[in-house]
Amino acid sequence: MAKDFLNGKRTHFGNKRSHALNSSRRAWKPNLQKVRILVDGKPKKVWISARTLKSGKVTRV
């Protein structure tokens, strides 16, 4: 399972709840993108969430 390289975001699991409060399992997945960034001065392909990219915490190479 992919995980955000910087802040460790990953899939969260829980229940879907219908109007009658029946439950079934579901997953919330972060919007992960494979991006080349500089890690220790070298370019590396890592998984980064779109939210992290938009915030400017990471710059692409």
From Swiss-Prot:
GO terms for molecular function: structural constituent of ribosome. GO terms for biological process: translation. Residues 1-26 are annotated as: Disordered. The lineage of its organism: Bacteria, Bacillati, Bacillota, Bacilli, Lactobacillales. This is Large ribosomal subunit protein bL28. Disulfide bonds: none annotated. Transmembrane segments: none annotated. It comes from the Bacteria. Keywords: Ribonucleoprotein, Ribosomal protein. GO terms for cellular component: ribonucleoprotein complex; ribosome. Pfam families: Ribosomal_L28 (PF00830). The keyword Ribonucleoprotein applies. The keyword Ribosomal protein applies. InterPro entries: Bacterial_rp_bL28, Ribosomal_bL28, Ribosomal_bL28/bL31-like_sf, Ribosomal_bL28_bact-type, Ribosomal_bL28_sf. Residues 9-19 have a biased composition (Basic residues). Belongs to the bacterial ribosomal protein bL28 family.
